[in-house]
Amino acid sequence: MAENQNYGTGRRKSSSARVFIKPGSGKITINQRELDVYFGRETARMVVRQPLELVXLTDKLDLYITVKGGGISGQAGAIRHGITRALMEYDETLRPALRAAGFVTRDARRVERKKVGLHKARRRPQYSKR
């Protein structure tokens, strides 16, 4: 299976994605399902395709992706990060364009923890002056 393929790992929130890139016709498979079947939301599909559209390789590469953990948004972000890393392994000259678009940087934002005495992370109980 290791014939002429490139690999990239992507993470976002609590999601982790493993991306394998091979020369092909532009087929994207996520957890043995098509991209359109796996992600019902158009925004998630758009996020996944962003790095490929940026470097104009949408119909030249096949992608095989396994993703675990998190929700739709986190998984889409993790896949985008993994595709970016795999593309850089595939062709190092793509790095400046991907960096300029902000795809290379790992989004380190996490869910803030709930604090004692508050409703949520920052939401305080209603204050009554009298």
Swiss-Prot record:
It comes from the Bacteria. InterPro entries: Ribosomal_Su5_D2-typ_SF, Ribosomal_uS9, Ribosomal_uS9_bac/plastid, Ribosomal_uS9_CS, Ribsml_uS5_D2-typ_fold_subgr. Pfam families: Ribosomal_S9 (PF00380). The gene is rpsI. One of its GO terms (biological process) is translation. Belongs to the universal ribosomal protein uS9 family. The lineage of its organism: Bacteria, Pseudomonadati, Pseudomonadota, Gammaproteobacteria, Pasteurellales. Keywords: Ribonucleoprotein, Ribosomal protein. Coiled coil: none annotated. The keyword Ribosomal protein applies. One of its GO terms (cellular component) is cytosolic small ribosomal subunit. One of its GO terms (molecular function) is structural constituent of ribosome. This is Small ribosomal subunit protein uS9.
